[in-house]
Regions:
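A domain-start/cap signature at the N-terminus of enzymes
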Residues: 22-88, 172, 176-177, 237-249
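Gly/Ser-rich "nucleophile elbow"/oxyanion-hole loop immediately N-terminal to the catalytic nucleophile
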Residues: 81-86, 136-168
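Active-site machinery of serine-nucleophile hydrolases
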Residues: 90, 94-145
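Short alpha-helix in the alpha/beta-hydrolase fold that links the catalytic acid
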Residues: 106-107, 220-238
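Short, proline-enriched alpha-helix->beta-strand connector loops that line the catalytic pocket
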Residues: 124, 203-209
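C-terminal catalytic histidine-bearing segment of alpha/beta-hydrolase fold enzymes
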Residues: 212, 216-218, 236-292
């Protein structure tokens, strides 16, 4: 009996040793560090339909661009058909003195101006950009250029159909901007203003220009409009253009009091010069041009 107990103890001990050895053999594998799975890049956010999320369109008010030339307050309009991919024409417009930047209380005062709104109401869908600058000299001209380039880089803009339109102080600004960077603009509407830029670069790049000034303009006077026309015409001739070619890209209109009276303006012809933005044929003339 004692021998049987001894044999059973030996058998039980051997079994325990065998189990312990198996457990120790399995331990390293169970504790081995498992390599992490490769990170999967997240999918782009899409709308429930599977299409990219829609782009905000309409009027985007009172934005700020911190540029190399300083702070640029601006607003812009994206037509409903803008999708962020299909390039559209763009019009850069600058208002007169009374709608420039004079602090927060003046912010957005350019948005009910006909010179901004008119382009949004045409059959041709266009991006419209307007800044409120603080002067009408070289600083403002370079800010207008910087804003134009910002939109060319960050929005779907047809680079061959970028236009400018300036009234009064805004015209002084944009006449310089167009002369400094004529490669950016296809056509320019110069309304009730004086020309402060050079002529030769505009002609050499073939920028189309429409000059508008009331014959009775009390601030600048029609002589400055004619001087701008003559300077540009001479520059086009010097660049080798024939007169009929010049006529296709350079226009001037200095309407008289009767013309203005037909449009409800009987005084303050400088301020009344804003009616040019109601002349659809002039706006469409601007938009008909592409960069050469």
């Amino acid at each position: 009996m004692q021998m049987l107990r001894f044999a059973l103890c030996l058998a039980l001990g051997a079994a325990l040793v065998s189990l312990s050895a198996c457990a120790q053999a399995a331990s390293p594998a169970s504790q081995a560090t498992v390599a992490p799975q490769a990170t999967v890049a997240p999918q782009a956010t899409v709308a429930p339909s599977g299409q990219p999320a829609p782009v905000q369109t309409g009027l985007i008010r009172e934005q700020i661009l911190e540029g190399e030339t300083g702070t640029i307050p601006y607003s812009y309009y994206l037509p409903e058909e803008y999708d962020g991919e299909t390039p559209l024409p763009m019009v850069v417009v600058m208002p007169g003195y009374d709608r420039m930047w004079f602090g927060e209380e003046s912010s957005g005062s350019n948005l009910d101006w006909s010179g901004f709104l008119c382009w949004t109401e045409l059959p041709q869908e266009s991006i419209v950009v307007s800044a409120q600058l603080t002067d009408w000299g070289e600083t403002s001209a370079r800010q207008a250029i910087e804003l134009t380039e910002h939109f060319l880089r960050n929005f779907a803009v047809d680079a061959d159909r970028v236009y400018a339109a300036g009234y009064s102080a805004g015209g002084e600004t944009l006449s310089q901007a167009v002369a400094l960077r004529p490669d950016l603009y296809a056509a320019y509407l110069h309304a009730a203003s004086q020309w402060d830029g050079a002529f030769a670069p505009v002609a050499q790049s073939g920028v189309a220009v429409y000059i508008f000034m009331a014959e009775g303009d009390e601030y600048y006077g029609p002589e400055r409009a004619r001087a701008a026309y003559d300077g540009l015409r001479s520059a086009y001739l010097d660049a080798g253009w024939a007169q009929e070619e010049i006529d296709a890209v350079l226009q001037i209109q200095t309407p008289d009091a009767e013309w203005f009276a037909q449009r409800g303006v009987t005084g303050n012809y400088h301020g009344g010069g804003n009616v040019v933005f109601d002349e659809t044929s002039i706006l469409e003339w601007i938009l008909s041009h592409s960069k050469r």
